[in-house]
Amino acid sequence: LYFEPVTVEDVLTIYEKEKPEGVIVQFGGQTPLNIAQALKDAGVKILGTQPEGIRLAEDREYFRERMIALDIRQPESGTARSLEEAVELGRQIGYPVMVRPSFVLGGRGMEVIYDEENLKRYGVEAIQVSPEYPMLIDRFLDNAIEAEVDALADGTDTFVATVMEHIELAGIHSGDSACAIPPVTIAPKHVRTIEEHAAKIARDFQVKGILNVQFAICDDEVYIIEANPRASRTVPIVSKVTGISMAR
């Protein structure tokens, strides 16, 4: 058992000493995903979803393109690399919008913006938007119901353990929202759509292991919010409720 920072240098030191079969990056939150490619480049064998598949989910622009190709509906969105681009995107999408920095942990910096003045304030004060620190802008789905799934996949087949319905409306970070298992108000047709979308994404990204996908249901349509090829905070809850040890 090691108590060390999750950095490339520290992981490599342990890897060289212990000589394991490989490294699993799915169970440490966002940080291991961020260093997966560097570990693979250093000769570490990555077990489960490969860094290439992880990048597909993490790169928001590429993710948007893949969702279009898979015919999965998503809120209108864009990536701004300057304050001017952010203002133009805000005008195109229409307010309110959901804004967040790219490549952050656990939804940090996420905010709902209702007008151009506050968008400018956010871009300057909150994240200092730039080519190195782009801003993600999505149409905010007002009064939407948020749903979430934890799935297991082997690159071909996908098993969705359950669909969770968030008690709070979409826009409240999932870490601050209670959820119901099984869903209470989500129509069966939407539950089926959510399960089908999760399976499509798992196959397309060649997920091997755990996949967490978040959805929003608005105006009788299912929208995808994001997909993360890793274990989420809900895995222990899902395992307890369903009696299925997802980590095992």
Spans of model-derived segments:
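ATP-dependent carboxylate activation and anion-phosphoryl transfer catalytic cores
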Residues: 1-22, 30-33, 45-48, 70-71, ...
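Redox-cofactor binding/interface segments in oxidoreductases and associated redox assembly factors
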Residues: 25
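Helix N-cap/beta->alpha junction signal
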Residues: 28-29, 60, 82, 115
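A short acidic, amphipathic alpha-helical/loop segment
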Residues: 34-38
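Intrinsic disorder at enzyme termini
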Residues: 40-42
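A conserved helix-loop-beta module that forms one wall/lid of the active-site cleft
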Residues: 49-110
